[in-house]
Amino acid sequence: MKFGVIVFPGSNCDQDVHYALGSVLGQNVDYLWHGDTSVSGYDCLILPGGFSYGDYLRAGAIARFAPIMPAVIDFARSGGLVLGICNGFQILLEAGLLPGAMMRNACLQFRCQWTCLKVDNNATPFTNRFREGQVVRIPIAHGEGNYYADAATLAQLEANRQIIFRYCSPDGEVTPAANPNGSVGNIAGIINREGNVLGMMPHPERCAEGILGGSDGRELLASIVDWWERGERLGA
């Protein structure tokens, strides 16, 4: 399987993602520069965390207009797998590949900590190694991770099982106390209706080896590989 990690000016998690995919999982992975205009030949694209273009205007607002983004949008709309992590999630929202918007954390502070996430849907290319309802530990590091969507959009996300991760307590209770940023419904990650584009604020690449304090992130990335190697394709 061949991955492309897109590097924007200000990205700072691209090397971690590259290491997790290449060195930990042994996959073929390349860096793609924001100025590239083609993503041909890749099976999965990853938009990593960081502060693309300094987060000026809004997080992800300028990156959405980078030269590579039309190719990313076409890739996603043709069924290609896309994972946006933290700033990558924000870019996917700005690009219209996922519904909703990101606001500043409700506490108005940058939050860097481990979080517990409840897996709400494991029937996706990104979560098939997890059990539905399983609690996983994946860290966050963001100042604008407060996900918002209007009531109609939230109802659609619920009805279509597009909410993939919710912040929760260690025993799986979805409570306000477990919510680090004020996200509506404790939402930590969502998928598009077609099931091929996932955006999440927590960083799976930061917990891909036990030496980092946990390996739940490895299971997410390995889910993509397993799904691909089984020959599964969305809409097939």
Swiss-Prot record:
Gene3D superfamilies, per the entry: 3.40.50.880
First-listed, main subcellular location of the protein, grouped into a coarse class: cytoplasm
Keywords: ATP-binding, Cytoplasm, Glutamine amidotransferase, Hydrolase, Ligase, Nucleotide-binding, Purine biosynthesis
Biological processes, Gene Ontology terms: 'de novo' IMP biosynthetic process
Keyword Kinase: no
InterPro entries: Class_I_gatase-like, PRibForGlyAmidine_synth_PurQ
PROSITE patterns attached to this UniProt entry: GATASE_TYPE_1 (PS51273)
Involved pathway(s): Purine metabolism; IMP biosynthesis via de novo pathway; 5-amino-1-(5-phospho-D-ribosyl)imidazole from N(2)-formyl-N(1)-(5-phospho-D-ribosyl)glycinamide: step 1/2
Annotated Glutamine amidotransferase type-1 domain residues: 3-234
Catalytic-site annotation from UniProt: 86 (nucleophile), 203, 205
Reactions this protein catalyses: N(2)-formyl-N(1)-(5-phospho-beta-D-ribosyl)glycinamide + L-glutamine + ATP + H2O = 2-formamido-N(1)-(5-O-phospho-beta-D-ribosyl)acetamidine + L-glutamate + ADP + phosphate + H(+); L-glutamine + H2O = L-glutamate + NH4(+)
One example GO MF annotation: glutaminase activity
Superkingdom, natural source: Bacteria
Cellular compartments annotated: Cytoplasm
Pfam families xref list: GATase_5
EC number(s) given by UniProt: 6.3.5.3, 3.5.1.2
Keyword flag Hydrolase: yes
One term under GO cellular component: cytoplasm
Self-association state and partner proteins as the record states: Part of the FGAM synthase complex composed of 1 PurL, 1 PurQ and 2 PurS subunits.
Function of the protein: Part of the phosphoribosylformylglycinamidine synthase complex involved in the purines biosynthetic pathway. Catalyzes the ATP-dependent conversion of formylglycinamide ribonucleotide (FGAR) and glutamine to yield formylglycinamidine ribonucleotide (FGAM) and glutamate. The FGAM synthase complex is composed of three subunits. PurQ produces an ammonia molecule by converting glutamine to glutamate. PurL transfers the ammonia molecule to FGAR to form FGAM in an ATP-dependent manner.
Protein name: Phosphoribosylformylglycinamidine synthase subunit PurQ
Annotated organism of origin: Moorella thermoacetica (strain ATCC 39073 / JCM 9320)
